[in-house]
Amino acid sequence: MASGWTHRLLLLAAVVTLGATPIAAASMEYLVTAPGYLTPNADIKITAVVTNPSSAGQLKVDLWGTRSGIQPEQHSSGKSDVRRWRSRY
């Protein structure tokens, strides 16, 4: 379950996208640095990737983050981020 701050970031990304993204748009990325808010005494870089599937009126929000001590998930692109949360709006 996402923390309160994480839930707010996901909702903010979704609301911003609702106002600015046409139905068939590609992914948009939001970069946020949130020191101490998601994890005490930590500086975590997070990226919310918001997609608006052409099939209909909902947004998919994936929140990725990097920080030491978390085993990264390897992607085919070689990116080593950790997906923290996923929500649909």
From Swiss-Prot:
The keyword Signal applies. Residues 76-89 have a biased composition (Basic and acidic residues). Residues 27-57 form a propeptide. Keywords: Antibiotic, Antimicrobial, Fungicide, Signal. One of its GO terms (biological process) is defense response to Gram-negative bacterium. Residues 68-89 are annotated as: Disordered. Disulfide bonds: none annotated. Residues 1-26 form the signal peptide. Has antifungal activity against C.albicans. Has antibacterial activity against the Gram-positive bacterium S.aureus and the Gram-negative bacterium E.coli. Lacks hemolytic activity against rabbit erythrocytes. This is Ixosin-B. It comes from Ixodes sinensis.
